[in-house]
Amino acid sequence: MERLNRNRSYQEELNFIEKINDYSYRIKLGFVPNMKVEGLFYADLPLEHLMFEELQHFCSCNGVGGFLPGVKQIGNVAALPGIVGKSIGLPDIHSGYGFAIGNIAAFDVANPKAIVSPGGVGFDINCGVRLIRTNLHERDVNPMKETLAQSLFDHIPVGVGSRGIIPMNARDLDEALEMGMDWSLREGYAWAEDKEHCEEYGRMLQADSNKISLRAKKRGLPQLGTLGAGNHYAEIQAVDEIYDSFAAKSMGINRRGQICIMVHSGSRGLGHQVATDALFNMEKAMIKDGINVNDRQLACARIASDEGQNYLKGMAAAANYAWVNRSSMTFLARQAFAKCFHTTPDDLDMHVIYDVSHNIAKIEEHVVNGKLSTLLVHRKGSTRAFPPHHPLIPVDYQLTGQPVLIGGTMGTCSFVMTGTSQGMSETYGTTCHGAGRALSRAKARRSLNYQEVLDRLNASGISIRVASPKLVMEEAPESYKDVTNVVETCHLAGISKKCFKLRPIAVIKG
């Protein structure tokens, strides 16, 4: 393991960071040891201030405390074997395990030394967002907002340790892990068209349930169809602004005030255990294969090795679990709305607009240095954003580009964007995923009062149902960067395009 150069002053560190334009910065070789490619990150002035403040704090305490700023993590990823292009940080980047959250990197599958790293995916494999539209207007919902919020809260199990109500045994779980949304469709928890509007059509074909440990399966079995805690939520939202009416209409959005439901959840304890198991195995693989990294949290294995392949197959199975999970909650949300409005989900036009992953690694084809290459793209805290006419996006969105779902923080707006050709060439067809933390969870708990946060949401006209009220401080808007700045930076940088904005009217949290 190489040690970071902790003796440089803040001013000396700044010599390695160069502003390219108003929205992007280059990290030069030498910023951390062993960099094989340069780094790149996107930020406007307010976000830039947060990035550099983090670096300045790191320099002032001489790196003591184990905390690494996002820019250093971008540099450490740029030192990994087999990386191509650049190590890229998005505007919502913040410090994470191994990779920063909001850090993307691609590795050349043809290079026998290229690696896969669980830290480049995260512990909540396929944590992601699904957006469901309705034909309801805000005026239809407002008189019964509290009833609807309670109905959603009653239907969807939430919170730490919550247990699902989808009946499942060990055999069902193995089938769900391998079949993804095809299992949901077979069991009657999804509509056929839901799959069409889902990244990977809701199923990663390389999934192998045999690569999931018994402990991971035991954690996952009771949790299917549950929201969980932390930053996971189900929100009833109203369309607040439409920026691109052509693209919005292709998604069934045609007026301000139209009601949507956003579900944000992942692979629960199963995905966490898959990552934990893989990290243990990869630390041994690194010794065996002589792999050196700057940060031991970047534990990795050669893509082609047994350890690398086992992780990718297990990760794919965990991703399938997450898609089944969001499909199960879609089923429950449809039931809740149908019950409240005394009609059917079909009559309410409760169709899935799209479902995206924010934590995943996938083999894709991209142009690097003018040559088409097969790459393993790690997206951690970031969203795939493929452009118009890309073969992997649905027919409905061929003219507009892939919908990109950007969740805000509790009580703030969310956005839908679309993928662009510029994003395809600059960021491997990837953009931001949300607001990105500005305060650590511990600092948020120390500095905020949960009752004040809840009162402020109520004063804003937002109905809220929370399983663990004291966890609310961790997810308060003050704990995060401004999602509007993040989205605007991506839009102005050209890596994705604004389509419409959503405003919360009811929030369900763990």
Swiss-Prot record:
Signal sequence region: none
InterPro entries hit by this protein: RtcB, RtcB-like_sf, RtcB_euk
Tree of life domain: Eukaryota
Database matches in HAMAP family: RtcB_euk (MF_03144)
Record's protein name: RNA-splicing ligase RtcB homolog
EC main group: ligase
Binding residue positions for Mn(2+) 1: D124, C127, H232
GO term, biological process aspect, one: tRNA splicing, via endonucleolytic cleavage and ligation
KW Cell membrane (keyword) present: no
Family: Belongs to the RtcB family.
Subunit structure: Catalytic component of the tRNA-splicing ligase complex.
Gene3D superfamilies from the UniProt entry: tRNA-splicing ligase RtcB
Enzyme Commission number: 6.5.1.8
Cofactor note: Binds 2 manganese ions per subunit.
Additional information: Ligation probably proceeds through 3 nucleotidyl transfer steps, with 2',3'-cyclic phosphate termini being hydrolyzed to 3'-P termini in a step that precedes 3'-P activation with GMP. In the first nucleotidyl transfer step, RTCB reacts with GTP to form a covalent RTCB-histidine-GMP intermediate with release of PPi; in the second step, the GMP moiety is transferred to the RNA 3'-P; in the third step, the 5'-OH from the opposite RNA strand attacks the activated 3'-P to form a 3',5'-phosphodiester bond and release GMP.
Required cofactor names: Mn(2+)
GO molecular function: GTP binding; metal ion binding; RNA ligase (GTP) activity
Annotated residues for binding of GMP: 231-235, 358-359, 407-410, 414, 433-436, 509
Protein task: Catalytic subunit of the tRNA-splicing ligase complex that acts by directly joining spliced tRNA halves to mature-sized tRNAs by incorporating the precursor-derived splice junction phosphate into the mature tRNA as a canonical 3',5'-phosphodiester. May act as an RNA ligase with broad substrate specificity, and may function toward other RNAs.
Binding, Mn(2+) 2: C127, H264, H358
Organism, scientific name: Trichoplax adhaerens
Catalytic activity: a 3'-end 3'-phospho-ribonucleotide-RNA + a 5'-end dephospho-ribonucleoside-RNA + GTP = a ribonucleotidyl-ribonucleotide-RNA + GMP + diphosphate; a 3'-end 2',3'-cyclophospho-ribonucleotide-RNA + a 5'-end dephospho-ribonucleoside-RNA + GTP + H2O = a ribonucleotidyl-ribonucleotide-RNA + GMP + diphosphate + H(+)
Matching PROSITE patterns: UPF0027
UniProtKB keywords: GTP-binding, Ligase, Manganese, Metal-binding, Nucleotide-binding, tRNA processing
A GO cellular component annotation in the UniProt record: nucleus
